């Protein structure tokens, strides 16, 4: 009888330990050994258990991979931030800054706004997060010259691969729907390309939509100009112009 009870207890203990062992094995996976879709599938398996703080370190590691390899998985980053939200003692401001930077690189998607809802306002005012919220405000209000001044004054931004390129591409998109033609001087200022050769190379990379004519750059194709002339409203114009008129 006692032997039967001992066996039952051992079976119960084994059943209890098995999920813990499986969980530990899951978070012990070396991310560097996974590539491409295999890595994404593994991360998706982790975030399915989105309230388990044990996965936070692995998601932080994956965030660093996103930074270094210029990839992006918003769901993984938002899951990590949610874990910080429910486990404030594990909060890592450096990791939050990195995920906010990746969200800015994905403008004009509202990823940054979504993440900001999960960050206490008092922490938003602390570095290294404050510089990101300031930049977000400049970009949202189309204060592009101020945005570049801010970016150039903080090495944090230049240390993130492709960050400046992504921000420049976002600004280019805004300019393309705002201006039909713009002076090459103003375009250089708004894109933070003071070197004429670099600016011309950038404009040429946008061809055939962008075209240089003397000191002016056309930012829209003839077809785009006609379509926008047919659909542009005064209400749209009244919202955009104040951000450029100083």
From Swiss-Prot:
Query: Could you tell me which Pfam families the record lists for this protein?
Result: CSN8_PSD8_EIF3K
In which domain of life is the source organism classified? Eukaryota
UniProt region (Disordered), positions on chain: 1-30
Boundaries of each PCI domain copy? 72-235
Is Cytoplasm a UniProt keyword of this protein? yes
Under the heading InterPro entries, the entry gives: ARM-type_fold, CSN8_PSD8_EIF3K, eIF3k, PCI_dom, Transl_init_fac_sub12_N_euk, WH-like_DNA-bd_sf, WH_DNA-bd_sf
Protein location: Cytoplasm
Record keywords, A-Z: Cytoplasm, Initiation factor, Protein biosynthesis
State the GO CC annotations: eukaryotic 43S preinitiation complex; eukaryotic 48S preinitiation complex; eukaryotic translation initiation factor 3 complex
- Similarity comment text for this entry: Belongs to the eIF-3 subunit K family.
Note the subunit structure: Component of the eukaryotic translation initiation factor 3 (eIF-3) complex.
Q: What is this protein called?
A: Eukaryotic translation initiation factor 3 subunit K
Natural source organism: Dictyostelium discoideum (Social amoeba)
């Amino acid at each position: 009888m006692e032997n039967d009870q001992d066996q039952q207890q051992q079976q119960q203990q084994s059943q209890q330990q098995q999920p813990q062992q499986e969980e530990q094995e899951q978070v012990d996976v070396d991310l560097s050994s996974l590539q491409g879709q295999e890595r994404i599938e593994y991360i998706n398996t982790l975030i399915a258990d989105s309230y388990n703080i044990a996965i936070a370190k692995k998601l932080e590691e994956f965030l660093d991979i996103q930074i270094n390899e210029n990839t992006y998985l918003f769901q993984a980053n938002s899951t990590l931030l949610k874990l910080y939200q429910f486990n404030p003692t594990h909060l890592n401001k450096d990791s939050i800054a990195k995920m906010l930077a990746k969200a800015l690189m994905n403008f004009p998607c509202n990823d940054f706004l979504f993440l900001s809802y999960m960050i206490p306002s008092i922490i938003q005012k602390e570095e290294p997060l404050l510089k990101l919220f300031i930049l977000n405000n400049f970009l949202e209000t189309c204060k592009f010259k101020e945005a570049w001044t801010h970016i150039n004054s903080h090495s944090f931004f230049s240390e993130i691969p492709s960050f400046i390129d992504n921000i420049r591409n976002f600004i280019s998109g805004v300019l393309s729907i705002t201006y039909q033609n713009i002076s090459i001087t103003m375009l250089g200022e708004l894109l933070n390309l003071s070197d004429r050769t670099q600016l011309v190379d950038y404009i040429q990379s946008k061809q055939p939509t962008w075209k240089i004519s003397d000191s002016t750059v056309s930012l829209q194709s003839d077809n785009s100009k006609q379509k926008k002339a047919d659909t542009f409203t005064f209400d749209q114009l009244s919202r955009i112009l104040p951000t450029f008129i100083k």
